[in-house]
């Protein structure tokens, strides 16, 4: 009998910090399951979840202001360890009888905290340096304006800085801990060890959450959910749908039918690569639909980016629906929904007024399809999906290649999309990526691609002049894709790529390089 991989679990209450998802990812990396819920969760919901421990996240608000978020009182009466981070520490202190004040000295960025003694379970045996008095020093990342000025009864101060007298506090008898810094960010060098101390040593969680156990659990769940029915999946060749295909195939074999739609907006040879990998190599049952003409006809004359996206989404649903109707026994639709999609959608347990979007991985299936949903990646972050993919035997290069937009080249051909433009762009993009790999630059940038500009520019070829199209190259470096810097690729490299594109691809007279950051520009041009 295999162990329940959700048996030991951490509940993270979200107070609005930009780092909250990072806390969850760090806990998962330790090997323990966790979920992210809104701060105003009910006692009944906490009891039902039955956490081994609770983490209170940071947040942008001030504990000193009326109406600011508070942890449910039950959190401190549930009989499980509690770890407050930044705002989480402040609300813990205030709710348990301590004092929090707004400070004129805002701490933001790197700081060094002094650990006061080594007897507490959270910070024991952790150090980055030693102070002259023999106390451990930790390099941490601060981001706060308020600070705790008096800790609750039964608590002790376990760390301090020159400007923050209570940088960390602990009540060992109840296993309550608070830190004013952010252990989840890499700038806090020993942060992972602090979280590991809390999750494993203090909460007593076993490390049951691994790629191998996630696969076993997903396969068992799929088999239980679909029984003897058949399943259909829209396979794009992207990371999420590829991992779903492998999981569902492992669970039910040939009762999975994958539909791969070649919409004419894919990268060079992508359709052939998908069919070869999943059909020939892994033996999945795949239907390839040649739909280039249908998509390009629908896009003809349209040059507005959002309208193009909607057309591409609508036509995909129509094509997929046509194929699904042919599969009379398909009762289930598999989708590559992942945990961040769930967090962002109204269906999420963190669903509040600030919901960002309603997510449907395939653009929303028609209601008349009346299929049940199979979403085996629903609990996983993107980095976990990739690790599961590696465990399933998918190639590293495929799992870790740069992001590609859902509408494909439809939003990298500016303005109206035509077959001629797509063919030119496909080849230019392939040259750029090939040269990045050859120069060992591909993994040094977060995303790189070519863009087709629908403007003609004069050029010289031999003794004659030519009047052809312009290609823009884009490469960025980013951690979270929310902000990005343009990549400072070597001039010699860019010159070589430009020469290859102009000399090898008919119809291009000029290559330019995009040196815009995000903000103000977005990463994609449309």
UniProtKB/Swiss-Prot annotation:
EC number(s) on file: 6.3.5.2
Annotated GO CC locations: cytosol
Catalysed transformations (reactions): XMP + L-glutamine + ATP + H2O = GMP + L-glutamate + AMP + diphosphate + 2 H(+)
Enzyme class label: ligase
Keywords noted in UniProt: ATP-binding, Glutamine amidotransferase, GMP biosynthesis, Ligase, Nucleotide-binding, Purine biosynthesis
GMPS ATP-PPase domain: residues covered: 209-401
Active-site residues, as the UniProt record annotates them: 86, 182, 184
Residue ranges occupied by any Glutamine amidotransferase type-1 domain in the UniProt entry: 9-208
The keyword Nucleotide-binding is annotated on this UniProt entry: yes
Residues annotated for ATP binding in this entry: 236-242
Keyword Cytoplasm among record annotations: no
Molecular-function annotations in GO: ATP binding; GMP synthase activity
Pathway: Purine metabolism; GMP biosynthesis; GMP from XMP (L-Gln route): step 1/1
Role, per record: Catalyzes the synthesis of GMP from XMP.
PANTHER family cross-referenced by the UniProt entry: GMP SYNTHASE [GLUTAMINE-HYDROLYZING], GMP SYNTHASE-RELATED
Complexes and interactors: Homodimer.
Annotated NCBIfam families: guaA_Cterm, guaA_Nterm, PRK00074.1
Protein name: GMP synthase [glutamine-hydrolyzing]
Organism: Aeromonas salmonicida (strain A449)
Gene: guaA
């Amino acid at each position: 009998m295999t162990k329940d991989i959700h048996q030991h679990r951490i509940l993270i209450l979200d107070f609005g910090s930009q780092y909250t998802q990072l806390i969850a990812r760090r806990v998962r990396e330790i090997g323990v399951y966790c979920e992210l819920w809104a701060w105003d969760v009910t006692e009944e919901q906490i009891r039902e979840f039955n956490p081994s421990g609770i983490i209170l996240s940071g947040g942008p608000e001030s504990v000193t202001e009326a109406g600011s978020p508070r942890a449910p009182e039950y959190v401190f009466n549930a009989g499980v360890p509690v770890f407050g981070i930044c705002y989480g520490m402040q609300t813990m202190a205030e709710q348990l009888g301590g004092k929090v004040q707004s400070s004129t000295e805002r701490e933001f960025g790197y700081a060094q905290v002094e650990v006061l003694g080594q007897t507490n379970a959270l910070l024991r045996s952790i150090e980055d340096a030693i102070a002259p008095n023999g106390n451990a020093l930790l390099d941490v990342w601060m981001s706060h304006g308020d600070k705790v000025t008096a800790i609750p009864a039964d608590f002790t101060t376990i760390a301090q800085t020159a400007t923050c007298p209570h940088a960390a506090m602990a009540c060992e008898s109840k296993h309550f801990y608070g830190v004013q810094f952010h252990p989840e960010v890499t700038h806090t060098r020993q942060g992972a060890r602090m979280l590991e101390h809390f999750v494993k040593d203090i909460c007593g969680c076993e490390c049951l959450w691994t790629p191998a156990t996630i696969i076993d659990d997903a396969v068992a769940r799929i088999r239980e959910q679909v029984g003897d029915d058949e399943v259909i999946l829209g396979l794009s060749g992207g990371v999420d749908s590829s991992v779903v295909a492998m999981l569902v195939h492992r669970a039910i074999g040939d009762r999975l039918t994958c539909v791969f739609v070649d919409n004419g907006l894919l990268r060079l040879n992508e359709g052939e690569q998908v069919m070869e990998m999943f059909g020939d190599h892994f033996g999945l049952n795949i239907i390839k639909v040649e739909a280039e003409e249908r998509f390009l006809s629908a896009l003809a004359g349209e040059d507005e980016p959002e309208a193009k996206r909607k057309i591409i989404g609508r036509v995909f649903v129509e094509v997929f629906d046509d194929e699904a109707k042919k599969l009379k026994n398909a009762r289930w639709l598999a989708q590559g929904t992942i945990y961040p999609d769930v967090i962002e959608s109204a269906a999420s347990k963190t669903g509040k007024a600030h919901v960002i979007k309603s997510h449907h991985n395939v653009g929303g299936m028609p209601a008349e399809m009346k299929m049940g949903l199979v979403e085996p990646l629903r609990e996983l972050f993107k980095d976990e999906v990739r690790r599961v993919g590696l465990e399933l035997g998918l190639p590293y290069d495929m799992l870790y290649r740069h992001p590609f937009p859902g509408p494909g080249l439809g939003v990298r051909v500016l303005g109206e999309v035509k077959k001629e433009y797509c063919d030119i762009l496909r080849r230019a993009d392939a040259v750029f990526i090939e040269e990045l790999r050859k120069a060992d630059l591909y993994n040094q940038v977060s995303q790189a691609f070519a863009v087709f500009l629908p403007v003609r520019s004069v050029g010289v070829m031999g003794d004659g002049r030519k009047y052809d199209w312009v290609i823009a190259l884009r490469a960025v470096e980013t951690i979270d894709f929310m902000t990005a810097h343009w990549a400072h690729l070597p001039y010699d490299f860019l010159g070589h790529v430009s020469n290859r594109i102009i000399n090898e691809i008919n119809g291009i007279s000029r290559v330019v390089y995009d040196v815009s950051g995000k903000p103000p520009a977005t990463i994609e041009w449309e």
